[in-house]
């Protein structure tokens, strides 16, 4: 399936791969340079390969149950009786089991990771739409979820707002290597 960010990813030089039925950027030409950008400034990456779950009702109880999964899932309140949960594709079944009554809404969002020491500054500088949900994954890693039609617009806004901060387009190869090596911890 074509991902919601594919047009801007190709435009910006991505080498595309398929992950869990979605096409995402593996790299933008040089994994080492992409990793360096994430460690020294800020990188943005397509994270449409992950699962997005919608939780409604007794959100506090659901998120408490989800805590048993640990760092494999992260969440954000999206209203008084609603939360959005993100996890790696392979952890989807465990998250759904822990949450009880969550809905898989992965295809309802474009997901953009914002990673690095300048990530918070970029999030502050970007003019994100009111429909955006921002989640703090861990350490220096954040995610922005927006409706698919807004994905390319938000990608471009992040590139523009992030230019003074040293923003770079980053592929999953770099993100996954940094995550595995735990070099993105604050």
Enumerate the language-model features and the residues they cover.
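Basic, glycine/lysine-rich polyanion-binding surfaces/domains
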Residues: 1-186
């Amino acid at each position: 399936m074509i991902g919601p960010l594919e047009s801007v990813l190709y435009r910006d030089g991505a080498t595309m791969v398929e992950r869990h039925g979605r096409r995402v950027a593996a790299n933008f030409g040089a994994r080492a340079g992409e990793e360096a950008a994430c460690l020294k400034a800020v990188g943005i990456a397509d994270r449409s390969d992950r699962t997005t779950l919608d939780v409604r009702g007794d959100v506090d109880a659901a998120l408490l149950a989800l805590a048993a999964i640990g760092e494999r899932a992260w969440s954000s309140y999206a209203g008084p009786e609603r939360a959005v949960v993100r996890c790696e594709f392979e952890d989807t079944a465990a998250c759904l089991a822990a949450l009880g009554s969550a809905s898989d809404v992965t295809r309802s969002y474009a997901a953009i990771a914002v990673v690095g020491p300048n990530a918070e500054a970029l999030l502050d500088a970007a003019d994100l739409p009111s429909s955006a949900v921002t989640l703090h994954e861990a350490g220096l890693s954040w995610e922005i979820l927006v409706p698919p039609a807004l994905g390319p617009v938000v990608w471009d806004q992040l590139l523009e707002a992030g230019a003074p901060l040293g923003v770079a387009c980053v592929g999953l190869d770099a993100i996954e290597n940094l995550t595995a090596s735990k070099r993105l911890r604050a």
